[in-house]
């Protein structure tokens, strides 16, 4: 089974420009580490021109901490296709950088242990939130001369119960199979502006990024505190438009079970810094969780 790229050439380059872009993002990359303290990372999934540098901070930290055997990558289901909780079952994912293998054994175990997920490829066919993470992983594993596998999971339902069930299933599957795992939660933060039908406050253009950051940081503080209930409570109270809370909640639950004791915000920005448009502004954050 092969999953072909759906957004190469739009969200990220489909040609040699991709390597040049990744080289620029990782120009300050250190040596591959071996500590393996990082249990999970949060990374955005917009077009690389907007959020690629922010995403690279998550992967830089993971590389310098030590690459795992398997990346379990969770992202929201933007298309509505397929199963509500869909684990890609087996095969390979292709990008302009080549192919990466799905950890079929881990995928099947997560689906079975969760009690809520299905093995389903349709949900992934056109979804970008996971695909845009893959070239970062491929680039770094090529540098390290290693092979890693992925388990892609899309979330059409995102709440505390899903987060707990999936986080627990990923941990139990990793323990049962003896896998060294890092969970990636693919999410953007606030989607502000008339284009998104969400204008909870008004601000001058030069003040807008700061105001959006204030709102996003209410959620980021909950993430840094490993507070799943608080995260979803803030989301509901604010009617916040973060698109991957279930992915982040799952990463928190898994990380706690895996012994994580600290979380760090590595980078934050908004699309306004590039677009200078107030019609549609999105927040992006890079976060890692460590044992």
From Swiss-Prot:
Out of the domains of life, which is the source? Answer: Archaea
Tell me which InterPro entries the record gives: MEMO1_fam (IPR002737)
Please report which protein family the annotation says this sequence is part of. Answer: Belongs to the MEMO1 family.
Q: Which Pfam families match?
A: Memo
The entry's protein name is MEMO1 family protein TGAM_1726
Query: Which NCBIfam families does the record match to this protein?
Result: AmmeMemoSam_B, PRK00782.1
């Amino acid at each position: 089974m092969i999953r072909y790229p759906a957004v190469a050439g739009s969200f990220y380059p489909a040609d040699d420009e991709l390597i040049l872009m990744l080289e620029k993002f990782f120009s300050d990359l250190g040596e591959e580490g071996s500590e393996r303290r990082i249990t999970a990372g949060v990374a955005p999934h917009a077009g690389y021109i907007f959020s690629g540098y922010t995403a690279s901070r998550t992967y830089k930290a993971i590389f310098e901490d030590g690459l795992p055997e398997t990346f379990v990558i969770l992202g929201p289901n933007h298309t509505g296709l397929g199963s509500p909780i869909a684990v890609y079952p087996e095969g390979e994912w292709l990008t302009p950088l080549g192919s990466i293998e799905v950890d079929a054994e881990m995928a099947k175990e997560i689906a079975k242990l969760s009690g809520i997920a299905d093995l389903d490829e349709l949900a992934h066919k056109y979804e970008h939130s996971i695909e845009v993470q893959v070239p970062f992983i491929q680039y770094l594993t090529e540098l390290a001369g290693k092979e890693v596998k992925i388990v892609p999971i899309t979330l059409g339902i995102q709440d505390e119960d899903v987060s707990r069930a999936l986080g627990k299933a990923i941990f139990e599957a990793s323990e049962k199979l003896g896998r060294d795992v890092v969970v990636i939660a693919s999410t953007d933060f606030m989607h502000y502006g008339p284009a998104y039908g969400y204008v909870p406050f008004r601000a001058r253009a030069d003040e807008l990024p700061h105001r959006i950051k204030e709102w996003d940081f209410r959620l980021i503080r909950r993430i840094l505190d490993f507070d799943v209930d608080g995260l979803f409570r803030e989301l509901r109270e604010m009617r916040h438009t973060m698109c991957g809370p279930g992915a982040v909640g799952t990463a928190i639950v898994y990380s706690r079970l895996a012994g994580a004791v600290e979380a760090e915000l590595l980078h934050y920005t908004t699309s306004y810094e590039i677009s200078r448009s107030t019609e549609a502004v999105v927040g992006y954050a890079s976060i890692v969780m460590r044992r």
